[in-house]
């Protein structure tokens, strides 16, 4: 039995990630899915929304809430999809939503689970990427020498 972790910072291109998982995972393997859910608007969206301030604060607040709701719905939908995939392929699934980006908790889980590999879906958007500390995560993973597969909105990094 092999153990892997999938960390989702982006919900773009999830069908491609599932294709990759189908090739990689075998029956009785275990997949830990950690889906990062936004609790507030990413800095990029915050900047764009503030530029339309003429709409009024209520509209800005509604737009911010809509963006967060869509991102949270995407996270929940993918976790349901991951359950279906686990059922059809007969691998064990452990999933949780991360309500607030906390790199230290992720590091502890990666160490604790003694993983055989990790899959991460980052965003191609540099503002979101900077917000989730992409470079810090990559540097840390290189130090612990854990095999990793990196995606950007579902596209495999070369």
Predicted regions span which residues?
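Gly/Ser-rich helix-loop-strand patches that form or flank binding pockets
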Residues: 110-158
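Small/aliphatic-rich secondary-structure junction motif
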Residues: 2-61
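A short acidic, glycine-rich active-site loop
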Residues: 57-74
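Short beta->alpha connector loops
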Residues: 10-14, 99-103, 124-125
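A short acidic, amphipathic alpha-helical/loop segment
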Residues: 16-21, 105-109, 136
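Structural beta-alpha unit
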Residues: 84-117
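Ordered, amphipathic secondary-structure segments that act as subunit-interaction surfaces
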Residues: 73-85, 89
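General small-molecule cofactor/ligand-binding pocket signal
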Residues: 32-34, 94-98, 149-152
């Amino acid at each position: 039995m092999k153990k892997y972790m999938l960390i989702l910072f982006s919900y773009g291109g999830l069908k491609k990630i599932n294709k990759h998982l189908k090739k990689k995972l075998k029956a009785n393997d275990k997949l830990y899915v950690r889906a990062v859910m936004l609790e507030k608007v990413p800095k990029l969206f915050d900047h764009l929304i503030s530029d339309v301030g003429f709409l009024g604060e209520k509209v800005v607040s509604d737009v911010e809430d809509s963006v967060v709701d869509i991102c949270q719905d995407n996270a929940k939908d993918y976790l349901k999809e991951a359950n279906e995939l686990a059922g059809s392929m007969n691998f064990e699934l452990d999933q949780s939503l991360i309500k607030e980006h906390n790199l230290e908790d992720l590091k502890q889980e990666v160490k604790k689970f003694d993983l055989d590999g990790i899959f991460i879906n980052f965003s191609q958007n540099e503002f979101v990427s900077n917000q989730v500390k992409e470079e810090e995560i990559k540097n840390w993973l290189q130090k612990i020498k854990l095999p990793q597969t990196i995606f950007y909105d579902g596209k495999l990094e070369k």
